[in-house]
Amino acid sequence: MQTTNLSYILGLDLGIASVGWAVVEINENEDPIGLIDVGVRIFERAEVPKTGESLALSRRLARSTRRLIRRRAHRLLLAKRFLKREGILSTIDLEKGLPNQAWELRVAGLERRLSAIEWGAVLLHLIKHRGYLSKRKNESQTNNKELGALLSGVAQNHQLLQSDDYRTPAELALKKFAKEEGHIRNQRGAYTHTFNRLDLLAELNLLFAQQHQFGNPHCKEHIQQYMTELLMWQKPALSGEAILKMLGKCTHEKNEFKAAKHTYSAERFVWLTKLNNLRILEDGAERALNEEERQLLINHPYEKSKLTYAQVRKLLGLSEQAIFKHLRYSKENAESATFMELKAWHAIRKALENQGLKDTWQDLAKKPDLLDEIGTAFSLYKTDEDIQQYLTNKVPNSVINALLVSLNFDKFIELSLKSLRKILPLMEQGKRYDQACREIYGHHYGEANQKTSQLLPAIPAQEIRNPVVLRTLSQARKVINAIIRQYGSPARVHIETGRELGKSFKERREIQKQQEDNRTKRESAVQKFKELFSDFSSEPKSKDILKFRLYEQQHGKCLYSGKEINIHRLNEKGYVEIDHALPFSRTWDDSFNNKVLVLASENQNKGNQTPYEWLQGKINSERWKNFVALVLGSQCSAAKKQRLLTQVIDDNKFIDRNLNDTRYIARFLSNYIQENLLLVGKNKKNVFTPNGQITALLRSRWGLIKARENNNRHHALDAIVVACATPSMQQKITRFIRFKEVHPYKIENRYEMVDQESGEIISPHFPEPWAYFRQEVNIRVFDNHPDTVLKEMLPDRPQANHQFVQPLFVSRAPTRKMSGQGHMETIKSAKRLAEGISVLRIPLTQLKPNLLENMVNKEREPALYAGLKARLAEFNQDPAKAFATPFYKQGGQQVKAIRVEQVQKSGVLVRENNGVADNASIVRTDVFIKNNKFFLVPIYTWQVAKGILPNKAIVAHKNEDEWEEMDEGAKFKFSLFPNDLVELKTKKEYFFGYYIGLDRATGNISLKEHDGEISKGKDGVYRVGVKLALSFEKYQVDELGKNRQICRPQQRQPVR
């Protein structure tokens, strides 16, 4: 079912894990005339949901740990082979085991000759436990708490070794750590027993010297040299050329590498960007800085370490009424926030001044090119030697040495130094970055694509660093191309990007917190409203609550007249009105900050004027003065006060600002589609990114209710609204609102009126895209039989029922990935695995009551068990609080952890089968049919890693060794991955939904409704047994949720 003759607008609603889409047909004037198709695409967000961390972070850390362990093991292997070649140790010695008093032997080696096996044990112990070695002088100035604790421990122990009490780290460990604390090694989370590797090297050299003096024949120079190399070798940090390979090239100068963030030019670019973009709101008017103000500020960040908004206010001599645009005044002491901080500039200055090189700094500060070289060197290179080599012959050695003690830079920007040096002179003149780019390069985003294509090309990953955004845009591209294949090229594309898209996890949490605060305030207002109007028959509507909130914000006064508002008459028709202070027809501003509660009698003649115009602010009338005093004395936010006191408005600029989403993601996608995708609309610009507030307004005025929590269909609802927000629709709404503002009584009495400009008849009803719009949209989005219902409910709109009408089916992106974590991190003892039991050591600070009940030897140590139980009860079963102070047995021995038993029916054997870890995730489930019954074979990541294709199917409530073998009598049907679409028929029920996962204990699978409808199953999820199912099929579904086909039988695929 394809068509290429359709003229349509494609509407998209993009979220962090969803793409809602709608195809809306338009006429020759590009007015929306009908809904052709609609749908939703759901996918997993590209981050860890609970923490917002990158999905790759845990794998990267685990990989780093594995490499560290592998390098240590390889180092020990090299040492053992060398000691065997030198005749110090034999294979038998290594098999039988070396002496385990290595710490004592290291001290004894200073006093007597060690035997060959003792000497070998000492050398291997030093190679294995070789402390920490820093490659940078300034590493102690880190913000990393863990690294700071490690360096503190290293420094403290180094200081102790400078005294005459301890000759070597081993002697310090025995005489101090073991004696005073009862242990030598670091305990959980502590680094107080960590040594500097250079101190261990000194111990190694001293041991060789002493053993040579005692006549040990295994102290030859080449042995000492080789052991020293093993002790001190460290993989070089990624530096210089290696970083450049990963760095990427400039947005504009394609052959140039990106510039370091801490170069002078990069910091100057950031400063000029902030300076030239700074906007001040005063008397409601918005303005940029003039040249005199720019010159007042331009050198200030170089003179002081930070420039705050409060300092900017003082330097510019701004009035109390003036505020800074985009600064959140809801926070306490908002203007104490930093406006600009030149971190690299002041870091270099302080480093030189602290070493007595103030004059040198004053000379260097006049040389931007040298400062660029310094910023580049300390960002690219990670060892003192490499940095010194790069800067030699560029800056004096005294400067290099001073900087090495203090500087540690990283991070790069998207522009190169070559590009910056072209752009900065124009920005010095006050031009914005985009203006400078257009003048130099002809385009803001780099070289523009001169040729569009019918399908949208892949999203350039190098330009979108945020993985969450990149996944959303990539999924949106798939949807766009699928729609184009079905319906041909669109005339226009309208895109709404969710407020959270492009925000960091922290910012999204702040938005969520703000929304929760707003919800709390609304709920409080609802409660107060109900208490005040106890005879109110129904639940208060949003408009009722809005009136009440505005009443409280305005101290119960009409802002236009200053008269008291009788709170008991708030619900009385015709008594008060909610007015757009700045007329909606001129601004399209429907925000809370543009709404005031006024007496209806005072609002009759305002029309579509601003308060400044209506109250004759131009001549500073008494009415205007009273209005200003009432606004300034209200509880309105600073931004709202500015809005209400606006004196001059540029209608086109206001409308453009309030209609269009100007955030980076919206701008990027808009430009990318405009430049790369063939659009057949008649306008020059056929991509529109509406502001989310406008979408919410239209959705509300068109009577479309968005229930986010119930299911995923609401994304489609927004996409339809976005598609219908055409320029012509905006004009119709503007004319209607203007008519309503000027002639409110005619709207109330449902009179029609002729627009004097266009001659068009203005309906007394809020404009809709087409007749029966609300009913048709609700049927298409929410009804499972739209064709039938459309015929029954909308007989007067037969064109609503066409060949493309079908139930909305949410498409979900399946997860085919088979790599990942092999097993869970915790390793348990496997000694009793044959009994189905593993033993785990649990720190007391994590000992919950249920774990205590499974304590090993509970019957043999009743006093210990009773003591632990009593301590937990004393602190309300909170182990962290209960064992914050040490716990001792009756004999005085401290207990830090206990062993507990756990049921272990399966797992992964590790550490030469001495340990067992729980399985990680099931990445694939293979479905078989045998004797007319269905069987499920789970495949885990560790099996994929080892190339094992398991053949045992789950038997409910049985151990894995009792599972059923899928032999020649079993037939493979298909493989299931998360979010695969399946159809399941049992004797009693029918399921058609997405596969979520498998319960290996019961053999049941979990299925989710395609739209996530929470009223079905248990929160939208069904748990179903498949063994006795009548039929079980897997389906393939396209990105649009339209083409759903049974997967054809295929051979079982290997895991690797």
From Swiss-Prot:
Name its GO BP terms in alphabetical order.
Answer: defense response to virus; maintenance of CRISPR repeat elements
Catalytic residues as annotated in Swiss-Prot or TrEMBL: D13, H580
Binding-site residues, Mg(2+) 1:
D13, E496, E500
Q: Which GO terms describe its molecular function?
A: DNA binding; endonuclease activity; metal ion binding; RNA binding
Q: Biotechnological application?
A: The simplicity of the Cas9-gRNAs RNA-directed DNA endonuclease activity may be used to target and modify a DNA sequence of interest.
The residues that hold Mg(2+) 2 are D13, E500, H715
Sequence ranges assigned to domain HNH Cas9-type in this UniProt record: 504-659
Instruction: Give the cofactors, semicolon-separated.
Output: Mg(2+)
Which terms are listed as keywords in the entry?
Answer: Antiviral defense, DNA-binding, Endonuclease, Hydrolase, Magnesium, Manganese, Metal-binding, Nuclease, RNA-binding
Give the EC number(s) listed in the UniProt record: 3.1.-.-
Which protein family is it in? Answer: Belongs to the CRISPR-associated protein Cas9 family. Subtype II-C subfamily.
**What domain notes does the record hold?**
Has 2 endonuclease domains. The discontinuous RuvC-like domain cleaves the target DNA noncomplementary to crRNA while the HNH nuclease domain cleaves the target DNA complementary to crRNA.
Protein name per its UniProtKB record: CRISPR-associated endonuclease Cas9
**Per UniProt, what is the name of the gene that codes for the protein in this document?**
cas9
